[in-house]
């Protein structure tokens, strides 16, 4: 299957490498396609030159990394990232730099963050790196350094390597920290702020500094107490002089932050009552986290909001199993760091019982034996190098298309693995060539020595005969004796030299035979452990590696949040339940059709318990938070009239929607190590690598939660619960012993792909897709004018959900932020922007077209 692609991959890699003339080192993103110097391949792996000499295989797989924690509606939520964001909305042009590499995450060292070191070698760097300390520092500097070291106290004793490091990274505090926590740069305006405050961005620098202080201080006041509404009056009262002198600017900043969900979001006590008269009617399809967040915002802005939910509960893919003392999340499960995460605010508003996830994750082989630490670390290091190599192929050699088809991460990894296997065979061949060459040299030498020995023997006989002539000998006879002696001495010396060379060759031959190179790149055992890491990466992305985009699969890595990953021990569903309080939600109501025109919208829905019962809802705007899996469904689950534009449907088709399933096992007692949150099970085959590969111990009650990822996630949905639970117990008995593992009291098996209201777990960047598609998914749709020549209509159909937020996809916080984003967009459209100057018009809405990326 891969043979046809091998030669092409090898040739492409060789050509690029020959042109680049690279050195060994770690590659940094952005090289070949940007016209900058090409970085070298990752150390320890066969470089592009080797690629040219042999077959290339398919590619295999970065987060994350990862694994991702539970997604907003999936089963695991990928690590988000901290970083400045241009307001809560990322525009179509805000592509993130590509990074690929590996790092440990708080969720466990098994999680790939898939980041490459951001290092670019320059000539100066290389020359400095090669200097010794004596060459680098002057004599005065060396003496001063020595004196300073004498005065320094001895370093504190380091903790044993086995111990968990509980320390958290330092984060900025004060107004600067408030901006950081809100994902904003503290010292400059974002592009969204610049668009909303043109008078400030075009004004003097001092005016911008005043704006930034007011903005950051307002954020700080909100974050200090997010349980109570932060009013304009309270903000003005607490602002220090002279920043409180410009009340108009303070009001504009407060209105902007409130409108865009940076303050007064989530569940908080209102100081000002909701307006009695509602302005504008909005129907929200779906009551997941994005829909609930948007609904609360729109309601607080004074709009009339109704949510239509097909399930008999709120939360969507945030689903918690509860029975007696047993609590376990079937969907979203992990908070991926609190530094910059809006869930940090929600966790203060809601009773979220957060607990850090310990990083230690022992692995157990198929026979139940623990994987030795040295073997575990060696394979994990190789896994990291393989990912770095695929990044090098993509970003430095631009090997992203093969036979006019986008290359997947899975293909790339197999390419690198096969190149490594070829490299091992090449080394074997070279080794045997050296042995054969040494043997030939030894054979030739021994033949010389045999011939020389015969000559010496013959010459010795001649010398003996010449010496036996009794004196007095004539001059001729004397000369003959001396010449024979001289020749004999020379031959003996030559023989001794050959004997010395013989010893060296025999020693070399012995060394070569005693130290053969490895005959395989990966033993079958190594490959099984490597497949465990691949399964973990498939968990992070909720899809087989063969479907992931090689170039863009980790495009959101720059926005990862800081801090430990945490679990919600009392169940993640406490969040949507709290968000739903006080909202108009129609449960068991499935939307069948959405009609949108220049004058308004109409939503047709049915009762899921009695499909003959139809409801029609008229409104000014519709916010669609349907999961991407439902939007991809064929035939369509929801009909749009008129049909969605081609640029929207193409984005839906290009993007990937993954699958990840869980098995919840509730026991009457703990039989595993209670100090460990994670332990892995290494499958026996590549095909089954994702089957029950990771067990989680997170809750107070004795519960184990097993994950099924990759190809196994889809296969498992067609197998009965009894068989799946039986397989789980067999694995656990192999690890802990048959007598130690009791029958579970309760079991639950998720099947997210079969769920008609989800059709999968969460989005991923499929081969052929990119971060641009998330931006396209977020774009609202404007109906065409009903009458030719009529004014350009306004947008009527809006979209939110984890699949619409480029920087934070496949996460609960991403869903939350997308809901806040769309609430601000809808309110600006129908209520006007309160933060604009009186002389400014509300920003116009562009005509409907394919958004330029």
From Swiss-Prot:
It is found in: Nucleus; Chromosome. Acetylated by KAT8 in epithelial but not in mesenchymal cells, thereby regulating the epithelial-to-mesenchymal transition. Acetylation by KAT8 reduces KDM1A association with nucleosomes, thereby decreasing histone H3 demethylation, leading to transcription activatio of target genes. One of its GO terms (cellular component) is DNA repair complex. GO terms for molecular function: chromatin binding; DNA-binding transcription factor binding; enzyme binding; FAD-dependent H3K4me/H3K4me3 demethylase activity; flavin adenine dinucleotide binding; histone demethylase activity; histone H3K4 demethylase activity; histone H3K9 demethylase activity. Keywords: Acetylation, Chromatin regulator, Chromosome, Coiled coil, Developmental protein, FAD, Flavoprotein, Isopeptide bond, Nucleus, Oxidoreductase, Phosphoprotein, Repressor, Transcription, Transcription regulation, Ubl conjugation. The modification Phosphoserine is found at residues 127, 132, 138, 167, 612, 850. Its EC number is 1.14.99.66. Disruption phenotype: Promotes neural differentiation. Accelerated emergence of neural progenitors and mature neurons in differentiating embryonic stem cells. There is a cross-link at residues 443, 470 (Glycyl lysine isopeptide (Lys-Gly) (interchain with G-Cter in SUMO2)). This is Lysine-specific histone demethylase 1A.
């Amino acid at each position: 299957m891969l043979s046809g692609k091998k030669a092409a991959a090898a040739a492409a890699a060789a050509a690029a490498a020959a042109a680049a003339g690279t050195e060994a080192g770690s590659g940094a993103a952005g090289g070949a396609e940007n016209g900058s110097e090409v970085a070298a391949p990752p150390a320890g792996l066969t470089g592009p030159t080797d690629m040219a000499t042999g077959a290339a295989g398919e590619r295999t797989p970065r987060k994350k990394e990862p694994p991702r924690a539970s997604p907003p509606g999936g089963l695991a939520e990928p690590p988000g990232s901290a970083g400045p964001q241009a307001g809560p909305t990322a525009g179509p042009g805000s592509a993130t730099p590509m990074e690929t590499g590996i790092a440990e995450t708080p969720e466990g060292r098994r999680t790939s963050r898939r980041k490459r070191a951001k290092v670019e070698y320059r000539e100066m760097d290389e020359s400095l790196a090669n200097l010794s300390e004596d060459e680098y520092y002057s004599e005065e500097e060396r003496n001063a350094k020595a004196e300073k070291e004498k005065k320094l106290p001895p370093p504190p004793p380091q903790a044993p390597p086995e111990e968990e490091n509980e320390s958290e990274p330092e984060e900025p505090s004060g107004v600067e920290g408030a901006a950081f926590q809100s994902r904003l740069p503290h010292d400059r305006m974002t592009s969204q702020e610049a668009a909303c405050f043109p008078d400030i961005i075009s004004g003097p620098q001092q005016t911008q500094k005043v704006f930034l202080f007011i903005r950051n201080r307002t954020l700080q006041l909100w974050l200090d107490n997010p349980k109570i509404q932060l009013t304009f009056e309270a903000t003005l009262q607490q602002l220090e002089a002279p920043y409180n002198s410009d009340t108009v600017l303070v009001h504009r900043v407060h209105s902007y932050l409130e409108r865009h969900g940076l303050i007064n979001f989530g569940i908080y006590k209102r100081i000002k009552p909701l307006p009695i008269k509602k302005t504008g009617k909005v129907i929200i399809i779906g009551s997941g986290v994005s829909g609930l967040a948007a609904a609360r915002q729109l309601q607080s802005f004074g709009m009339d909001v109704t949510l239509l939910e097909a399930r008999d509960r709120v939360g969507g893919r945030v689903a918690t199993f509860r029975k007696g003392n047993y609590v376990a999340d079937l969907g979203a499960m992990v908070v991926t760091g609190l530094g910059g995460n809006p869930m940090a605010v929600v966790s203060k508003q809601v009773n979220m019982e957060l607990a850090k996830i310990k990083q230690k994750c022992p692995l157990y082989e198929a026979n139940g034996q623990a994987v030795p630490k040295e073997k575990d670390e060696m394979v994990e290091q190789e896994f990291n190098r393989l990912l770095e190599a695929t990044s090098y192929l993509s970003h430095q050699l631009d090997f992203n298309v093969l036979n006019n088809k986008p290359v997947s991460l899975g293909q790339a990894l197999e390419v690198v693995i096969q190149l490594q296997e070829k490299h091992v065979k090449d080394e074997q061949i070279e080794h045997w060539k050296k042995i054969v060459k040494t043997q030939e040299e030894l054979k030739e030498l021994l033949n010389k020595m045999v011939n020389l020995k015969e000559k010496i023997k013959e010459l010795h006989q001649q010398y003996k005969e010449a010496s036996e002539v009794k004196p007095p000998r004539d001059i001729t006879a004397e000369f003959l004796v001396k010449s024979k002696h001289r020749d004999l001495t020379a031959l003996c010396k030559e023989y001794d030299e050959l004997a010395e060379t013989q010893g060296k060759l025999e020693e070399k031959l012995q060394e070569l035979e005693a130290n053969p190179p490895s005959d395989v790149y990966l033993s079958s055992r190594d490959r099984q452990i490597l497949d465990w890491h691949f399964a973990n990466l498939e968990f992070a992305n909720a899809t087989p590696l063969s479907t992931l985009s090689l170039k863009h699969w980790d495009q959101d890595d720059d926005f990862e949040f800081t801090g430990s990953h945490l679990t919600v021990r009392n169940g993640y569903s406490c969040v949507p339940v709290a968000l739903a309080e006080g909202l108009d939600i129609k449960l068991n109501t499935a939307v069948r059709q959405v009609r949108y025109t220049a004058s308004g919208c109409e939503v047709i829905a049915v009762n899921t318990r009695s499909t003959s019962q139809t409801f029609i809802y008229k409104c000014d705007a519709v916010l669609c938070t349907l999961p991407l899996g439902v939007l991809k469904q064929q035939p369509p689950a929801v009909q749009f009239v008129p049909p969605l534009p081609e640029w929207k449907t193409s984005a839906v088709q290009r993007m990937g929607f993954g699958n990840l399933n869980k098995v919840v096992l509730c026991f009457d007692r703990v039989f595993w190590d209670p100090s460990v949150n994670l332990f892995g099970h290494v499958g026996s085959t590549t095909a089954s690598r994702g089957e029950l590969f990771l067990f989680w111990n997170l809750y107070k009650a004795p519960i184990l939660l097993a994950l099924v990822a990759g190809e196994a996630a889809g296969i498992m949905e067609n197998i009965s619960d009894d068989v799946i639970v039986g397989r789980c117990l067999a694995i656990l008995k192999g690890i802990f012993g048959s007598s130690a593992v009791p029958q579970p009291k309760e079991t639950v098996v998720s099947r997210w792909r079969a769920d008609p209201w989800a059709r999968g777990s969460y989005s991923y960047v499929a081969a052929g897709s990119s971060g641009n598609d998330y931006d396209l998914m977020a774009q609202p749709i404007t109906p065409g004018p009903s009458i030719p020549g009529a004014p350009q209509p306004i947008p009527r159909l809006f979209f939110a959900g984890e699949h619409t937020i480029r920087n934070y996809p496949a996460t609960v916080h991403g869903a939350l932020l997308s809901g806040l984003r769309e609430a601000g967009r809808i309110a600006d459209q129908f209520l006007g922007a309160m933060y604009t100057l009186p002389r400014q018009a509300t920003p116009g809405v562009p005509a409907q077209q394919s958004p330029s990326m």
